[in-house]
Curated annotation (Swiss-Prot):
HAMAP family: HemL_aminotrans_3. One of its GO terms (molecular function) is glutamate-1-semialdehyde 2,1-aminomutase activity. Keywords: Cytoplasm, Isomerase, Porphyrin biosynthesis, Pyridoxal phosphate. The gene is hemL. It comes from Methanosarcina barkeri (strain Fusaro / DSM 804). It is an enzyme of class 5 (isomerase). It is found in: Cytoplasm. One of its GO terms (biological process) is protoporphyrinogen IX biosynthetic process. Its cofactor is pyridoxal 5'-phosphate. It comes from the Archaea. This is Glutamate-1-semialdehyde 2,1-aminomutase. The modification N6-(pyridoxal phosphate)lysine is found at K268. Belongs to the class-III pyridoxal-phosphate-dependent aminotransferase family. HemL subfamily.
Length: 424
């Protein structure tokens, strides 16, 4: 159990942090009101703060920790690479090996490029799509989150929506005029937008499952119709699988739903918890990237040996242990029990999610961004604090997904469900 008194060290650290770091945090989603707890360590399914409080963690660093925190296989791979050096500025065999593994699971990827973040992956993918097609416009989904670069910070999910600022100052209007938006799960609206702009349209970029505004899952047939629409209109389809990649299945949402896009972005899990991003696609598209072609992309830390080594380790482990069925069944079980709890309590909440992703939404089940905005954000925040006091760490935003890991035990899950029953 925690209380205001037991978070004193975190409160003091927050007061100091505010004088040195804007908002006291390095990413807005971490700005828990009235102040966040500061982490001292994490292991398995647990995370511990400066005051020694331990929590069962369903935030999991916002998705990367599919195996749980501090996994020994990943840790040993990083240690082994550190002994050889951690930054060279040259190509490595590791990059080739990881690229081959990834391409083997994603039929949309003939070739790929490593970068350092998910933001870089989507930024580079969109630049490449424009360079390949010679067109400037692209469509994103309302509430879709594709990182923090200028082109996509329009009605963005994640921390932007949590703070009530889904758009950002500092982005010229002339720049975002090329960013079009369509509501999720509305193929008619998407069709109209694509057909109206097809001669100027480079790509549609979409999170197959909206992970930063729910999660919100696709209605039956939506992704299939979107794939058909983009093919018929000669528009590239980009799947942003930074969250869903290697989480829903080894082949991500593409395997789970049976859809093959033209380009794919990855991150989070594929780096084993170290900074990484990936963008890949069909050979004729990817060969437009420098030095093979005229679309420029570069980065000092791209293909960082430690990140690549961690990525190989986590994919090897996933291949050997075949954990997805087990982890996804944990998610299925949690959602089923939460649905029973909500029904028994007679409250107007909904249970959302897929595979190892889940959430209780403080309102009716949303199918798009506008419906998600109708939720009770303040009610969720109060609930978050009650759960934290019960030793359960959920994402502090109503719009961020809860994740289950391979490390969560039956005891962890039952304790969590008991806390839900007591705190809703």
């Amino acid at each position: 159990m925690t209380s205001e008194a037991t978070l004193e060290k975190s409160r003091q650290m927050y007061e100091k942090a505010k004088t040195l770091i804007p908002g006291g945090v390095s990413s807005p989603v971490r700005a828990i009101k009235p102040y966040p707890f500061y982490t001292a360590s994490a292991n398995g399914s647990k995370i511990k703060d400066l005051d020694g409080n331990e929590y069962i963690d369903y935030c999991l660093a916002y998705g990367p920790a599919l195996l749980g925190h501090n996994h020994p296989v990943i840790k040993e791979a990083i240690k082994a690479q550190l002994d050889k050096g951690w930054l060279y500025g040259t190509p490595t065999e590791l990059e080739v090996n990881l690229a081959e593994k990834i391409a083997g699971y994603y039929p949309s990827i003939d070739m790929l490029r490593f970068v350092s973040t998910g933001t870089e992956s989507t930024m580079s993918a969109l630049r490449l799509a424009r360079g390949f097609t010679g067109r400037n416009k692209f469509i994103k989904i309302e509430g879709g989150f594709h990182g923090a670069h200028d082109a996509v910070l329009v009605k963005a999910g994640s921390g932007a929506t949590t703070l009530g600022e889904p758009d950002s100052l500092g982005i010229p209007a002339d720049f975002t005029k090329y960013t079009l938006q369509a509501p999720y799960n509305d193929i008619e609206a998407m069709t109209g937008l694509v057909e109206k702009n097809r001669d100027e349209l480079a790509a549609v970029i979409i999170e197959p499952v909206l992970g930063n505004i729910g999660p919100i899952t696709p209605l039956p047939g939506y992704l299939e119709e979107l794939r058909k629409l983009t093919l018929e209109n000669d528009v590239l389809l980009i799947f942003d699988e930074v969250i869903t990649g290697f989480r829903l299945a080894m082949g991500g949402a593409q395997e789970y739903f049976g859809i093959v896009p033209d380009m794919t972005t990855l991150g989070k899990i594929v780096g084993g918890g170290l900074p990484i991003g990936v963008f890949g696609g069909k050979r004729e598209i990817m060969e437009m990237i420098s030095p093979s072609g005229p679309v420029y992309q570069a980065g000092t830390f791209s293909g960082s040996p430690c990140s690549i080594a961690a990525g190989i380790a986590v994919l090897d482990y996933l291949e050997q242990e075949k954990i997805h069925e087990k982890v996804n069944s944990k998610g299925d079980y949690i959602r089923a029990v939460l649905t029973e709890i909500v029904e028994d309590e007679g409250i107007d909440y909904s249970v959302c999610g897929i595979a190892s992703m889940f959430k209780i939404f403080f309102g009716a089940e949303p199918h798009n961004y506008q419906e998600a905005l109708k939720c009770d954000k303040e009610g969720y925040l109060a609930f978050f604090h009650r759960m934290l006091a019960s030793g359960i760490f959920l994402p502090p935003s109503q719009f961020e997904t809860n994740f289950v890991s391979a490390a969560h035990s039956e005891e962890d899950i039952e304790k969590t469900l008991k806390a839900y029953t007591e705190n809703l």
